[in-house]
Amino acid sequence: MDTLGRLLLLATLFLTPAEAQQASERRLKPWLVGLAAVVGFLFIVFILMLANRVWCAKGRAEDEEATFRMEHIMNENSQPSKADKKQKKKVDRKGGQSNEALELEEKESSDEERGKKTAL
């Protein structure tokens, strides 16, 4: 019976009817409410970004080691071989590579100029 009495006492304390507050005369302007909403939203996004950064963070030593490995591999691969150097010298001796698209445009423009210079 003691527990039943305690439950009834707690029920009457927590389930008492709520009284409405008096309406305050002071209300915020609409632009201030919007500004507060935007600031609140940006604050929530900031907190979520911090949580994401902490949650998904990796160890710095691992990142630096992987970067060092990649740079080392890239430096080894970036050194041109002797065959590549010889081929480049041959292309330079021949006068370089030609841009066929540019030559085609030059030919078309010369055809148009001929059409303009015809006498009537």
From Swiss-Prot:
The modification Phosphoserine is found at S109, S110. Disulfide bonds: none annotated. The keyword Ribosomal protein does not apply. Pfam families: MAP17. GO terms for cellular component: membrane. The keyword Lipid biosynthesis does not apply. Residues 71-120 are annotated as: Disordered. It is a single-pass membrane protein. Keywords: Membrane, Phosphoprotein, Signal, Transmembrane, Transmembrane helix. This is Small integral membrane protein 24. It is found in: Membrane. Residues 1-20 form the signal peptide. The gene is Smim24. Residues 102-111 have a biased composition (Acidic residues). Its main location: membrane. The chain crosses the membrane at residues 31-51. Belongs to the PDZK1-interacting protein 1/SMIM24 family.
